[in-house]
């Protein structure tokens, strides 16, 4: 599988033929653009690194902020102002966009920092990314779980330089920049420096080493060098007072001269960042080749858990690449929580549970059960320390946790692990937090009134009680089992028996048709409520556009009327949004697996 992965798939707007057949009747509001990047990654690792252009939403690529219609361009070609660390992958408007610690290889004065160079050549494979800039400098990057190693090949020049910018963060979109709250940077000795920035409430520490013994090392501030300076400290930074700052190595180069930079990262201070670097990359000073080989080996082992047999080279590549993308996030960072002092599993970029709880997480559990247990344990620690099981969780601090999207979504993941009997879980401890979480946010309204609005949360909470009952049974708590059974049955309160659909309500990125075909824990009763198999299939056929005319997709900067007309179709979105991802499989429960096959084949072919 490794050889068939193409990390560039999913980094551009889709290039697909005009939809035909059943797929031509579907309508989707979201832009058909892949929100991924081709940068260096490690399976479920903490660190990634890639070329930075400021584009939405990863920092890589050519596109501007887009939530509807066709994606507008930010750049006409692939460009980069340098190479940054920590990227989102597969998300949309996630609001925390990272792209910290930018490295810019330059032959120009420091005043040119921030300009965009054309990328004249790019290559990538799992764990490795390479780009050549029109300045003639080639960059290669590889990463470990908590580290990154850069290798730069320079042309001949009297004063080449590598500029590390610690003030950098976010995207080049409206309100997309991330400004550090505080920062410090310390040049320890020739070729070695450490620093820490507090960004989005998280303290990100870095230890960096340069393997060139004779290059000058200098701190800089506001694009001015600080000869002889060894330390920079900043506090209470705001956008109007921020000036770029960082460090630089500079010196003459011969044609083809190679210089390496090694980075260790940590959320627990500079000494742990240094320890991470030594543990993953050795004592140095050079470690690119070995780190790349080790990361490639790990990717081969991980991807090798799946075998793809197909005569189609295109489908082999698409499936292999999709598998690769499914194993980049969440980021597992053991013993790295900056928010509590104990050494525990820790995870971030759970972005979001709404996207992954019934899609990626079951796949992760099947392929890497021990990592699924690690993630589940991290979720429970987050719940214990922060008061709720997250819907979304990033390398950040704050209450912006996507609670409108759904409720009690971690419960499905935990119940799966419990049913499978995977070792390493404390189910008594898990039951405490699952039960407590059911009463938070919309949970109180659900308990008091039997229904919660938005109405989709009624389905979430009823299913959450069903899942938590699995844990109660595992630990033998009969009292909780008796409490949960009637609460799990309250999913019925969400539906209008006159229409067989959900009651009118507000909905997150969808309408009642999108949410009405969620897979529930009692599908027989759900189908009966809709009037039986035939009536339920009729509703599904209406939703999937069986026999309907082709529709027109929204264009560039669509008008409100254009979007309103599309939403009024109440049509399937082609697996392009979360609310109706499960819907094709609802046919199975009404005795029409052929219809499921029709929809799935239409998705694959279009």
List each model region and its residues.
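Accessory carbohydrate-recognition regions in carbohydrate-active enzymes
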Residues: 1-458, 472-493, 499-514, 518-594, ...
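ATP-dependent phospho-/nucleotidyl transfer catalytic cores
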Residues: 464
